[in-house]
Amino acid sequence: MSQQDKKLTGVFGHPVSDRENSMTAGPRGPLLMQDIYFLEQMSQFDREVIPERRMHAKGSGAFGTFTVTKDITKYTNAKIFSEIGKQTEMFARFSTVAGERGAADAERDIRGFALKFYTEEGNWDLVGNNTPVFFFRDPKLFVSLNRAVKRDPRTNMRDAQNNWDFWTGLPEALHQVTILMSDRGIPKDLRHMHGFGSHTYSMYNDSGERVWVKFHFRTQQGIENLTDEEAAEIIATDRDSSQRDLFEAIEKGDYPKWTMYIQVMTEEQAKNHKDNPFDLTKVWYHDEYPLIEVGEFELNRNPDNYFTDVEQAAFAPTNIIPGLDFSPDKMLQGRLFSYGDAQRYRLGVNHWQIPVNQPKGVGIENICPFSRDGQMRVVDNNQGGGTHHYPNNHGKFDSQPEYKKPPFPTDGYGYEYNQRQDDDNYFEQPGKLFRLQSEDAKERIFTNTANAMEGVTDDVKRRHIRHCYKADPEYGKGVAKALGIDINSIDLETENDETYENFEK
């Protein structure tokens, strides 16, 4: 049947006799409650908005293909990497972090970089960003980050004071803040930025040998960024600039590609590493742990319906496949709970049945038979009348011990250990990053910082200047000048780092 031949029905299939005129008591009388189509349409409309993501609410997505280009089977027995040339269907979602669904794409912000690979061993979600580090390394601070970068509870406006008060209370945040204030703080669009798994993960091979890894995704389109002025001009005319760019590029066959790399660290190297190798505020230097090519992914198909595929896409780092595993990274450990929990709230307990989230390489009849019922259980007949318990005398649903992971290394007693006693090397890496910038790029960091700190109180500005100075004196002096603060009025060599536990006024 053509679109032109289709006739209007209600959601349960009943013919609709009149789409434009409500049922009333007389031509000018009140509406009748028996106008079923009107009631149905309004009640459906009243409920069609689902909760937005607490972070990463504004997003764009596309389907694509991952292809293995290099052999890494000595590190992992994950089937997705089993042979050169192997292809796996995937879905990618990119996002801003702080803004709501209607936020502008060209804001200065971190970009989410979430990938879902539909492998024959289940879905693998790699939930990353366009930066290799994060603002802090303990997940107990995550809720406060959300509060600081979003709207003030009194004014309901984004508040730079809240934002910078939080960031400058965490000296370890300077690395991420430096990236955010640099040229890469505003990618021109989603195609012209790198992506990172950010966390440390692990791989293991057929012999049960484990290595620690970090994932990198380098754009094949090249890096392109926007200045504050360019971004403001774009936002004034197109708040969906990045989404539009990605969609239109794919529609015309200009498919964007990224190359996947890993960095590898042995367990012995991790024991002797200068810093905590699982610290999300730090990178592994490439000269010590070089990038190893793995493959590439291409995005080549736009979703047919944004809500169905992009808004309902659910990513969680707990979705991991044999051959890959987690690490002691505290932030990763915290996300193992929070992401799945948030998706169950936002989309429901059976959100895995939504097509974009369904495991495509595993038959639906093989999905866990012990997870049953719940709202909107629709696609698998709720496992019918089959066995729903274990053990059972039918020999059904036995465990698969061949997929057991190698023992996970841990040490120490359970305790709330002070992270600052373990590692207070906050400023080495942001200092090195600053020194890698060209002179023009450094000046833009100073200017961008001053723009972002407009309206922030002097005590918070001074804390930030002090942290910048500790990373590199030129960094501190440049920020102070841009902020119009005499650097000689600041105690630059105080021994007490200004953390949320120990502010110096």
UniProtKB/Swiss-Prot annotation:
GO MF term (any one): metal ion binding
Please provide, in alphabetical order, the Gene Ontology terms of the cellular component aspect for this entry: cytoplasm
Cofactors: heme
Single biological process term from Gene Ontology? hydrogen peroxide catabolic process
What is this enzyme's class at the first EC digit?
oxidoreductase
Q: Which CDD domains match?
A: catalase_clade_3
List UniProt keywords, sorted A-Z: Heme, Hydrogen peroxide, Iron, Metal-binding, Oxidoreductase, Peroxidase
Signal peptide per UniProt: none
Q: Where is this region: Disordered?
A: 1-25
Q: Which of this chain's residues are annotated to bind heme?
A: 339
Q: Which reaction does it catalyse?
A: 2 H2O2 = O2 + 2 H2O
The UniProt entry, under PROSITE patterns, shows:
CATALASE_1 (PS00437), CATALASE_2 (PS00438), CATALASE_3 (PS51402)
Q: Where is the active site?
A: 56, 129
Entry coiled-coil feature ranges: none
Its EC number(s)? 1.11.1.6
Record's keyword annotation contains Iron: yes
Quaternary structure, per UniProt, is: Homodimer.
The record's comment on protein family reads:
Belongs to the catalase family.
Main role? Decomposes hydrogen peroxide into water and oxygen; serves to protect cells from the toxic effects of hydrogen peroxide.
Q: What PANTHER family does the annotation carry?
A: CATALASE
Protein name, entry field: Catalase
Originating species = Staphylococcus aureus
